A protein has these predicted regions:
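In a subset of proteins, long, contiguous C-terminal domains/tails are tracked
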Residues: 15, 31-33, 72, 77, ...
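Glycine-rich, flexible loop segments associated with nucleotide phosphate handling
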Residues: 61-71, 110-112, 166-170
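Catalytic beta-strand/loop cores that center a nucleophilic Ser/Cys/Thr
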Residues: 101, 108-110, 116-224
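A structural signal for well-ordered alpha-helical segments within the folded catalytic domains
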Residues: 4, 65, 69, 89, ...
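Helical hinge/lid and interdomain linker segments adjacent to catalytic or ligand-binding clefts
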Residues: 1-98
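Extended alpha-helical regions
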Residues: 5-9, 14-24, 114-116, 120-126, ...
Length: 236
């Protein structure tokens, strides 16, 4: 469903695009694309897909290990992968990105936003956020919030937290959830404690390319037009 919303929005705004199926990723020439979007989907569905006995063969299965390696090589050679919401968990885990989803294992009894408008603060100086206002709104539907993984160096005096990440894999923070008064419309529980000030969008370098992680769905149901720009800017 998320792929359909994404495709509809891009077609509506006259973006040239291809829908990539499993074999296109595994065996195709990905270098022809400036960006590859991974719509919101579970890691299991991306990697393994649906079983052959539940769907026609052309719609079953996933990209598998070969597809994952193809995506990794694509980014390392200069491509950009754009992950929306749930698919960001898959890329963080499988590509070993130095960032984490801080609400991944948080129980719904302490933090829950089933589908609400939340405030986000944008770093407007970057080309990926061009045209956005510093204060904006995102649609949060059981979505993600990120934080950079701290590196620790063990020396003679014990462990020391490194304040700066080595230049080989920098993380560029593009948007954060507001620190307070996060909820704009809808219902939320535990929002300030769990996502207040956390990263909502980031770009992580990978070889000569990068992975853009958008913790929410900027194109959800083709409705939140104010965040379409975050998706569009990520394509170039």
């Amino acid at each position: 469903m998320d792929e359909g919303w994404t495709r509809w929005v891009l077609e509506k705004y006259n973006f040239p695009l291809d829908t990539l199926h499993n074999q296109d990723i595994i065996n195709g020439d990905l270098s022809q694309y400036s960006a590859i979007i991974i719509p919101s989907q579970s890691g299991s569905a991306i990697l393994h897909g649906y079983a052959d006995n539940t769907y026609p063969k052309e719609y079953s299965g996933g990209i598998g290990l070969n597809g994952l390696l193809a995506l990794k090589e694509y980014a390392e050679k200069g491509g950009r992968i754009v992950a929306l919401d749930e698919s960001s968990d898959f890329l963080i885990e499988q590509l070993g990105l130095p960032i984490k989803n801080v609400v991944k294992n948080t129980p719904s009894t302490t933090f829950f936003i089933p589908g609400s408008l939340v405030r986000i603060d944008i770093e407007t100086s970057d080309q990926l956020t061009f045209g956005m206002r510093k204060e904006s709104v995102a649609y949060f539907v059981r979505s993600r919030a990120f934080d950079i993984i701290e590196l620790r160096d063990t020396g003679e005096g014990g462990k020391e937290t490194l304040k700066q990440r080595p230049p080989s894999q920098p993380v560029k923070i593009l948007a954060r959830y507001a620190k307070k008064d996060i909820l704009l419309s809808g219902w939320a529980m535990g929002e300030e404690k769990n996502i207040g000030g956390k990263i909502a969008m980031a770009e992580v370098s990978l070889g000569r390319g990068s992975v853009v992680l958008i913790g929410f769905r900027p194109q959800f149901r083709a409705q939140p037009r104010n965040t379409f720009k975050l998706l569009f800017n990520s394509l170039y």
